[in-house]
């Protein structure tokens, strides 16, 4: 394929392309969102992959550039460390002057042995999960709020899960296998709603990617937590809704919790609301 050109910022630090930041964008759904934005909307977006380990971020960028996508770079970004978030925001602000889309994608799914490689109290697993999935999500939005506020159409996409749904969890016992994740994603949805109300001129939404073939899900399926009854679905489809929410205009939806549902009879991709 023809190689895309990376657009440098203008003299005032602004870029004509929309600037997208994806936390945890070096792998899984986050990486696929980056790939699809560059593949299908490369003339519109410049993508910044946030990675806890900068080396992994550079590896992800190299993989994308190998496919011909140039409008991408990496930044070190650990959502559990406010200093890391602040440093990333400073780098991006000095280079581009703003961001337009923030994907709050970084997250963890811990087993009761993941923290110390030995059994730990359930409460400790909850606290460690909340540190990334909830406090980290909020810290990320807070850290990038000044740059988002400069843009004319800020969009924030929280990558969450149906594991957050009390209604579904009450109805299906199979959804109780990862309660720390469920509690964290329910709290993350509340954080999303908080920002939806706080910034009425932004587009703030929650997105469920589905049960997808990512490294996180493969680890989960091999763990003691899993009651998986089928193989995960292709990762490509898991990015569709997040990409859609990235494209929203000033009159687009906000305050929603949605997922991709497949292709309808009209040949168009279908999306639906999920129960809280």
From Swiss-Prot:
Uppermost EC category: oxidoreductase
Keywords on record: Monooxygenase, NADP, Oxidoreductase
Active-site residues (renumbered): 161 (proton donor), 185 (lowers pka of active site tyr)
Source domain of life: Eukaryota
Membrane-spanning ranges: none
Pathway named in the protein's UniProt entry: Mycotoxin biosynthesis
Residues that hold NADP(+) according to the record: 29, 51, 78, 105, 185, 214
GO terms of molecular function: monooxygenase activity
EC nos: 1.-.-.-
UniProt record similarity statement: Belongs to the short-chain dehydrogenases/reductases (SDR) family.
PANTHER family: (+)-NEOMENTHOL DEHYDROGENASE, SHORT-CHAIN DEHYDROGENASE_REDUCTASE
Record function comment: Short-chain dehydrogenase/reductase; part of the core atranone cluster (CAC) which products are predicted to catalyze most or all steps of mycotoxin atranone synthesis, starting from geranylgeranyl pyrophosphate (GGPP). The initial cyclization of GGPP to dolabellane is probably performed by the terpene cyclase ATR13. The Baeyer-Villiger oxidation near the end of the atranone synthesis, which converts atranones D and E to atranones F and G is predicted to be catalyzed by the monooxygenase ATR8.
Name of the protein in question: Short-chain dehydrogenase/reductase ATR10
Source species of the chain: Stachybotrys chlorohalonatus (strain IBT 40285)
Gene it is expressed from: ATR10
């Amino acid at each position: 394929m023809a190689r895309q050109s990376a657009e440098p910022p203008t003299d005032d630090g602004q870029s004509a392309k929309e600037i997208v930041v994806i936390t945890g964008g070096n792998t899984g759904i986050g990486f696929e969102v980056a790939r699809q934005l560059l593949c299908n909307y490369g003339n519109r977006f410049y993508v910044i992959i946030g990675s806890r380990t900068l080396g992994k971020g550079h590896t992800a960028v190299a993989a994308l550039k190998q496919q011909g996508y140039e409008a991408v770079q990496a930044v070190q970004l650990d959502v559990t460390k406010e200093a890391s978030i602040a440093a990333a925001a400073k780098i991006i602000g000095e280079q581009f002057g703003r961001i337009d889309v923030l994907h709050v994608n970084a997250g963890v799914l811990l087993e009761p042995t993941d923290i110390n490689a030995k059994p730990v109290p359930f409460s400790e697993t909850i606290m460690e999960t909340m540190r990334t999935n909830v406090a980290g999500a909020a810290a990320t939005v807070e850290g990038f709020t000044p740059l988002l506020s400069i843009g004319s159409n800020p969009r924030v996409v929280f990558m969450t899960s149906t594991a957050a749904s009390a209604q579904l969890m009450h109805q299906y016992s199979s959804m109780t296998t990862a309660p720390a994740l469920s509690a964290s994603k329910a709290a993350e949805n509340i954080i999303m709603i908080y920002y939806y109300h706080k910034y009425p001129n932004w587009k703030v939404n929650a997105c469920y990617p589905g049960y997808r073939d990512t490294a996180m899900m493969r680890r989960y399926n091999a763990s003691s937590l899993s009651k998986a009854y089928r193989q995960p679905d292709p990762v490509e489809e898991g990015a569709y809704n997040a990409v859609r929410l990235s494209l929203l205009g000033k009159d687009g939806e906000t305050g929603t919790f949605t997922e991709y549902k497949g292709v309808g009879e009209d040949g168009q991709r279908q999306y639906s609301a999920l129960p809280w």
